[in-house]
Each structure stands twice: as structure tokens, then as C-alpha cells.
Amino acid sequence: MIGEDDELQGLTPAEAFRHAKVEHFLGHARDYADMGRYLAGLKVLDAVFGLDPSNEEGKLLKGTIDDTVAHIHKRTTNGKREDADGIQARPRRSDLVMIVDQDERLLTSLTGTLRRYGFMAITASSYDEALETFSAFRPEVVISEVNFETGPKGFDLYLWLKTSPGNQDVPFLFLATRIDRETLIAGKRFGVDDLIMKPVDDDVVIASVINCISRRRSSQIRA
């Protein structure tokens, strides 16, 4: 069996360094795909192809991400679709949830949980990435950390969403390790749909997501 050390034999130092960078980027791209950071994964793969345009593993991974993104874009989210039993407001398998948090382990864990319950999931790890991801995919629900370590905070994302045309009724849930009284009052005043404390209980997250989607869909039906 030919191992990685055998593959590196005969490479010049520059070629070996380039190979190491490619493997490093591929590792990040795989991780991003697993946690639902598809836009970040595609950007990292661009770096892979800049170093190795014919990289087969990169091509396979890009194909997988492209297929997933296409599937997300094809979901049906508009209109009042009535199920066979006449219940219109229940969540659908096509419902997309966006999670925003700087903890990549949490992103991977929650993405897996949502998928197991039949939802689609996308993620972002910063305010700017969240804006780009939301604009690209238009999720049905947003779950965001309250306090990012750097940059704009979760409330900034919430206010951006609620002041963007057509997005005012998108449910928004906050994640928090701890929260002060002023932030809690502000969240209630501004109309945040729910606050979920960390460490996250998967059942609580799923129940909150289902409840928010059902409430939103019921109001759309009444309208």
C-alpha cells in the first residue's frame, strides 16, 4: 500500500510545501461541509484549485457541496401548501435553519441534530458570513449566538434582519451561555422569538424551531 510518505518522496521542498497546503485546505473544506458552512467551504476549495487545479478530492468535494447547495435552493418555501390531512402550518422537510456561532463544534453538532429531525441546515461563524449566507439561502429560521467574541453582535444581526425588506417575519432564536438582565429585556422588547441557554439541549432546540415555524406559517395562512 502506498502511503502519504511514499507519495511525498521525490518532491522538491516547494512541491512538498504545496502538497501540505492543499491537504490543510482540504481538511478545512471537509469540516466546513460537515458543519453546513458551504460558502466558506467553496472559498477554501478555490484556494485548493489555485494550488492544484486538477485535485481529484477537491473536485469530488466541490461536487458534493454544489449538489447540496442546489438541493437547498430547490426547496419550496412559498405559498400555502396544504398537506393531505389539511394541516398547513406544520414544518416541512424543506425548511432551512441557519445557525450562527463561533463554536465550530456546536455548529457541527446542531447541524447533525437538525438533519436527523428532517430539517436542512446552513451555518456561519461571524456576522459578515451570516449576512452573506442569509442573502444566498433565505432560511426559514435563524439561530444565533448573542455575543460574538469579535465584530458585531447577535443583536446587530437580529436588527439587520428585522429591518431588511421581506425578512421581518423570519423567526430568530438566540443562543447564550449567560445573559444579563438588560439584554434579556431588550430581546423581549424587540420581539426575539426565543432564548436558548448553553449547553444546548437538542430537544429544546428542535421544539423551539418547530414552534416558530408553525407560528409563522399559521400567520401566513391567516393573512
Regions found by a protein language model. Give the residues of each.
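The C-terminal output helix
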Residues: 71-73, 210-223
